[in-house]
A protein has these predicted regions:
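Post-cleavage N-terminal segment of exported redox proteins
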Residues: 2-60, 137-138
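Residues at alpha-helix boundaries and short interhelical turns
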Residues: 18, 80, 94-97
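Extracytoplasmic electron-transfer domains, predominantly the class I c-type cytochrome c fold
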Residues: 28-32, 91-138
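Sequence/structural segment immediately N-terminal to covalent heme-attachment motifs in c-type
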Residues: 45, 57-80, 101-109
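Short amphipathic alpha-helical interaction/hinge segments
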Residues: 81-84, 115
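Short cysteine/histidine-rich zinc-coordinating motifs and their immediately flanking basic loops
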Residues: 85-90
Length: 138
């Protein structure tokens, strides 16, 4: 009798634990980003991060990018880009043009494997200015 009660309690705790992980993932709907102060980049995507140092807009882009990252990316990629294992650790992203190329491809096209969406197409919702600001922050 006691074993059945203990088993049920463990099962209930396991279900609650898994439920908590599911709900902890949070809302992944992209949130608006205020890019006031950054120059307009136009509709055509740039190949290279326009805010990379020594750009005069670098510091503002980092500030905007930090806020935008925390609103839109941290749920999966972790605070300060330190992944908890759900998504790639963005600290390992190359800071050069090569990293820009990968980043641009990923934010425009997202990541879909076998029909499962691992990352939404962020460029459908966020502006190029906002996304390059996030890249600058990273």
């Amino acid at each position: 009798m006691n074993n059945k009660i203990i088993l049920r309690a463990l099962l209930a705790a396991g279900v609650l634990g898994v439920s908590g992980l599911v709900f902890a993932h949070g809302d992944v709907t992209p949130q608006a980003v205020n890019t006031k102060g950054l120059p307009a980049l136009g509709e055509e995507w740039l190949d290279e991060n326009p805010y990379r140092a020594p750009s005069e807009h670098h510091d503002l882009a980092v500030q905007i990018g930090s806020s935008a990252y925390n609103q839109n990316c941290a749920r999966c990629h972790g605070l300060e880009a330190i992944s908890g294992g759900i998504a790639p650790d963005l600290r390992e992203l190359e800071a050069s043009y090569d990293g820009d190329e990968w980043y641009k491809e990923r934010v425009i096209n997202g990541a879909v494997r076998d029909g499962a969406v691992y990352m939404p197409r962020m460029a459908d919702t966020l502006s190029q200015e906002a996304l390059w600001a996030i890249r600058t922050y990273i």
